[in-house]
Amino acid sequence: MKVRRIAFQEREGFYKNMWRKGVLSLVTIAIFTAAALAQESRSEISVQGTGFFTKDSNGQGIRQKATDTGGFLVGYRYNLNRWFAAEANYGFVRNTQQYSVPLGISGIQTNVNQYTGGIVFKVPSPVRFKINPYLLAGGGALVFSPTDNSLITGADTQAKGAFVYGGGADYALSNHFSLRAEYRGLVYKSPDFGLSALNTDAVTHTAQPSAGIVFRF
Protein backbone atom coordinates (compact mmCIF):
# COMPACT_ATOMS: atom_id res chain seq x y z
CA MET A 1 0.00 0.00 0.00
CA LYS A 2 2.82 2.33 0.88
CA VAL A 3 4.52 1.65 -2.45
CA ARG A 4 1.27 2.33 -4.31
CA ARG A 5 0.73 5.59 -2.42
CA ILE A 6 4.24 6.73 -3.25
CA ALA A 7 3.75 5.83 -6.90
CA PHE A 8 0.44 7.70 -6.96
CA GLN A 9 2.03 10.78 -5.38
CA GLU A 10 4.87 10.69 -7.87
CA ARG A 11 2.43 10.38 -10.77
CA GLU A 12 0.30 13.22 -9.35
CA GLY A 13 3.39 15.41 -8.96
CA PHE A 14 4.41 14.60 -12.52
CA TYR A 15 1.02 15.68 -13.93
CA LYS A 16 0.99 18.88 -11.85
CA ASN A 17 4.46 19.73 -13.09
CA MET A 18 3.41 19.08 -16.69
CA TRP A 19 0.32 21.25 -16.21
CA ARG A 20 2.41 24.13 -14.87
CA LYS A 21 4.82 23.82 -17.79
CA GLY A 22 1.91 23.75 -20.24
CA VAL A 23 0.34 26.88 -18.77
CA LEU A 24 3.72 28.62 -18.76
CA SER A 25 4.28 27.65 -22.40
CA LEU A 26 0.86 29.00 -23.43
CA VAL A 27 1.48 32.28 -21.62
CA THR A 28 4.91 32.59 -23.24
CA ILE A 29 3.47 31.91 -26.71
CA ALA A 30 0.70 34.47 -26.14
CA ILE A 31 3.21 37.12 -25.09
CA PHE A 32 5.48 36.54 -28.08
CA THR A 33 2.49 36.44 -30.46
CA ALA A 34 1.20 39.77 -29.15
CA ALA A 35 4.67 41.29 -29.48
CA ALA A 36 5.01 39.99 -33.04
CA LEU A 37 1.62 41.39 -34.01
CA ALA A 38 2.52 44.75 -32.51
CA GLN A 39 5.73 44.80 -34.54
CA GLU A 40 3.92 43.81 -37.74
CA SER A 41 1.56 46.80 -37.96
CA ARG A 42 2.13 47.11 -41.68
CA SER A 43 -0.90 49.14 -42.77
CA GLU A 44 -1.20 52.92 -42.54
CA ILE A 45 -3.97 55.41 -43.27
CA SER A 46 -3.10 59.09 -43.61
CA VAL A 47 -5.12 62.31 -43.84
CA GLN A 48 -3.31 65.50 -44.87
CA GLY A 49 -4.07 69.10 -45.71
CA THR A 50 -2.28 70.23 -48.87
CA GLY A 51 -1.21 73.25 -50.84
CA PHE A 52 -1.45 73.15 -54.65
CA PHE A 53 0.89 75.51 -56.52
CA THR A 54 1.13 75.13 -60.29
CA LYS A 55 3.78 76.60 -62.58
CA ASP A 56 2.59 78.83 -65.43
CA SER A 57 2.84 77.28 -68.88
CA ASN A 58 3.17 78.80 -72.34
CA GLY A 59 2.70 77.37 -75.79
CA GLN A 60 1.15 78.00 -79.19
CA GLY A 61 0.54 81.65 -78.37
CA ILE A 62 -1.38 80.82 -75.17
CA ARG A 63 -0.35 81.48 -71.59
CA GLN A 64 -1.95 79.32 -68.91
CA LYS A 65 -2.01 80.07 -65.18
CA ALA A 66 -3.69 78.06 -62.41
CA THR A 67 -4.67 79.82 -59.20
CA ASP A 68 -2.92 78.70 -56.02
CA THR A 69 -5.21 76.76 -53.72
CA GLY A 70 -5.44 74.15 -50.97
CA GLY A 71 -7.15 70.82 -50.52
CA PHE A 72 -6.73 67.44 -48.91
CA LEU A 73 -4.98 64.12 -49.53
CA VAL A 74 -5.92 60.74 -48.08
CA GLY A 75 -3.76 57.66 -48.50
CA TYR A 76 -3.19 54.03 -47.70
CA ARG A 77 0.33 52.64 -47.32
CA TYR A 78 1.39 49.01 -46.88
CA ASN A 79 4.87 48.43 -45.48
CA LEU A 80 6.45 45.55 -47.41
CA ASN A 81 9.55 45.47 -45.20
CA ARG A 82 11.79 47.88 -43.28
CA TRP A 83 12.98 49.45 -46.54
CA PHE A 84 10.02 49.64 -48.91
CA ALA A 85 6.29 50.32 -48.90
CA ALA A 86 3.54 50.60 -51.53
CA GLU A 87 0.93 53.35 -51.37
CA ALA A 88 -2.24 54.65 -53.03
CA ASN A 89 -3.60 58.18 -52.64
CA TYR A 90 -6.63 60.29 -53.47
CA GLY A 91 -6.54 64.07 -53.40
CA PHE A 92 -8.92 66.93 -54.13
CA VAL A 93 -8.54 70.65 -54.77
CA ARG A 94 -10.52 73.34 -56.58
CA ASN A 95 -8.81 76.05 -58.60
CA THR A 96 -9.30 78.20 -61.69
CA GLN A 97 -7.44 77.57 -64.93
CA GLN A 98 -6.84 80.95 -66.56
CA TYR A 99 -5.96 81.27 -70.25
CA SER A 100 -4.52 84.36 -71.92
CA VAL A 101 -5.48 84.09 -75.59
CA PRO A 102 -5.38 86.67 -78.42
CA LEU A 103 -9.03 87.57 -77.79
CA GLY A 104 -8.59 88.14 -74.05
CA ILE A 105 -8.48 86.18 -70.79
CA SER A 106 -10.80 83.30 -69.99
CA GLY A 107 -11.09 81.12 -66.91
CA ILE A 108 -12.44 77.68 -66.05
CA GLN A 109 -13.17 76.90 -62.41
CA THR A 110 -12.15 73.28 -61.95
CA ASN A 111 -12.41 70.43 -59.47
CA VAL A 112 -9.12 68.52 -59.60
CA ASN A 113 -9.29 64.90 -58.45
CA GLN A 114 -5.94 63.18 -57.94
CA TYR A 115 -5.50 59.40 -58.17
CA THR A 116 -1.94 58.16 -57.67
CA GLY A 117 0.06 55.19 -56.52
CA GLY A 118 3.72 54.50 -55.99
CA ILE A 119 6.65 53.00 -54.14
CA VAL A 120 8.11 54.45 -50.94
CA PHE A 121 11.75 54.04 -49.91
CA LYS A 122 12.12 54.38 -46.15
CA VAL A 123 15.40 56.01 -45.12
CA PRO A 124 16.86 54.34 -41.98
CA SER A 125 17.16 56.57 -38.91
CA PRO A 126 17.88 55.98 -35.19
CA VAL A 127 14.76 54.92 -33.29
CA ARG A 128 15.46 57.35 -30.45
CA PHE A 129 14.86 60.33 -32.79
CA LYS A 130 11.27 59.17 -33.53
CA ILE A 131 11.64 60.58 -37.06
CA ASN A 132 11.19 58.29 -40.08
CA PRO A 133 12.13 59.99 -43.39
CA TYR A 134 11.21 58.56 -46.79
CA LEU A 135 11.34 59.15 -50.54
CA LEU A 136 8.54 58.35 -52.97
CA ALA A 137 7.96 57.94 -56.70
CA GLY A 138 4.99 56.80 -58.75
CA GLY A 139 2.31 57.85 -61.16
CA GLY A 140 -1.38 58.25 -61.71
CA ALA A 141 -3.88 60.71 -63.11
CA LEU A 142 -5.28 64.17 -62.47
CA VAL A 143 -8.92 64.52 -63.50
CA PHE A 144 -9.98 68.10 -64.29
CA SER A 145 -13.75 68.64 -64.06
CA PRO A 146 -15.23 72.08 -64.89
CA THR A 147 -17.75 73.42 -62.38
CA ASP A 148 -20.97 75.27 -63.20
CA ASN A 149 -19.14 78.56 -62.54
CA SER A 150 -16.82 78.20 -65.53
CA LEU A 151 -16.72 81.14 -67.96
CA ILE A 152 -16.07 78.99 -71.03
CA THR A 153 -18.79 76.84 -72.60
CA GLY A 154 -18.03 73.46 -74.15
CA ALA A 155 -15.29 72.53 -71.67
CA ASP A 156 -15.29 68.80 -70.88
CA THR A 157 -13.85 66.74 -68.04
CA GLN A 158 -10.31 65.69 -68.91
CA ALA A 159 -7.79 63.28 -67.36
CA LYS A 160 -4.05 63.82 -67.58
CA GLY A 161 -1.41 61.24 -66.72
CA ALA A 162 1.03 62.40 -64.04
CA PHE A 163 4.46 61.45 -62.74
CA VAL A 164 4.78 61.82 -58.96
CA TYR A 165 7.95 62.25 -56.92
CA GLY A 166 8.74 63.56 -53.47
CA GLY A 167 9.57 62.77 -49.90
CA GLY A 168 8.65 63.42 -46.32
CA ALA A 169 9.03 62.36 -42.72
CA ASP A 170 6.85 60.87 -40.00
CA TYR A 171 7.25 61.84 -36.35
CA ALA A 172 6.06 59.03 -34.06
CA LEU A 173 3.62 60.06 -31.33
CA SER A 174 2.93 56.46 -30.27
CA ASN A 175 2.98 52.95 -31.72
CA HIS A 176 -0.11 53.74 -33.78
CA PHE A 177 -0.07 57.49 -34.46
CA SER A 178 2.41 59.78 -36.22
CA LEU A 179 2.55 63.30 -37.59
CA ARG A 180 3.51 63.58 -41.27
CA ALA A 181 5.09 66.38 -43.29
CA GLU A 182 5.45 65.71 -47.01
CA TYR A 183 6.29 67.24 -50.37
CA ARG A 184 4.94 65.84 -53.62
CA GLY A 185 5.77 67.10 -57.11
CA LEU A 186 3.37 66.36 -59.98
CA VAL A 187 4.53 66.55 -63.61
CA TYR A 188 1.82 66.42 -66.29
CA LYS A 189 0.55 67.99 -69.50
CA SER A 190 -1.51 71.15 -69.05
CA PRO A 191 -5.27 70.58 -69.46
CA ASP A 192 -7.22 72.11 -72.34
CA PHE A 193 -10.63 70.51 -71.57
CA GLY A 194 -10.93 69.24 -75.12
CA LEU A 195 -10.84 72.76 -76.60
CA SER A 196 -8.15 73.26 -79.26
CA ALA A 197 -8.22 77.03 -78.66
CA LEU A 198 -6.83 76.39 -75.13
CA ASN A 199 -4.20 73.81 -76.05
CA THR A 200 -0.72 74.95 -74.99
CA ASP A 201 0.82 71.52 -75.70
CA ALA A 202 3.06 72.21 -72.69
CA VAL A 203 4.15 70.17 -69.69
CA THR A 204 3.62 71.79 -66.30
CA HIS A 205 4.55 71.13 -62.68
CA THR A 206 2.55 71.34 -59.45
CA ALA A 207 4.17 71.57 -56.03
CA GLN A 208 2.05 69.94 -53.33
CA PRO A 209 3.34 70.41 -49.76
CA SER A 210 1.23 68.80 -47.06
CA ALA A 211 0.98 67.98 -43.37
CA GLY A 212 -1.30 65.65 -41.47
CA ILE A 213 -1.70 62.60 -39.27
CA VAL A 214 -1.03 58.88 -39.79
CA PHE A 215 -2.78 55.93 -38.15
CA ARG A 216 -0.87 52.64 -38.20
CA PHE A 217 -2.58 49.28 -37.68
Spans of features found by a protein language model:
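Cleavable N-terminal export/targeting peptides
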Residues: 1-41
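Short glycine/proline- and aromatic-enriched beta-strand/turn motifs that initiate or cap beta-hairpins
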Residues: 37-79, 86, 139, 143-146, ...
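Residues that define the transmembrane beta-barrel architecture of outer-membrane proteins
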Residues: 41, 66-72, 111-115, 131, ...
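Repeated loop/turn-to-beta-strand initiation elements of outer-membrane beta-barrel proteins
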Residues: 43, 83-86, 127, 173-179
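Transmembrane beta-barrel strands of outer-membrane/channel proteins
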Residues: 45-51, 88-92, 135-141, 169, ...
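Outer-membrane beta-barrel translocator domains and adjoining extracellular loop/strand segments
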Residues: 56-63, 98-104, 145-153, 191-198
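Gram-negative (and chloroplast) outer-membrane scaffold detector with strong preference
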Residues: 75-150, 206-217
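Predominantly the C-terminal beta-signal and adjacent terminal strand-loop region
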Residues: 90, 95-99, 171-217
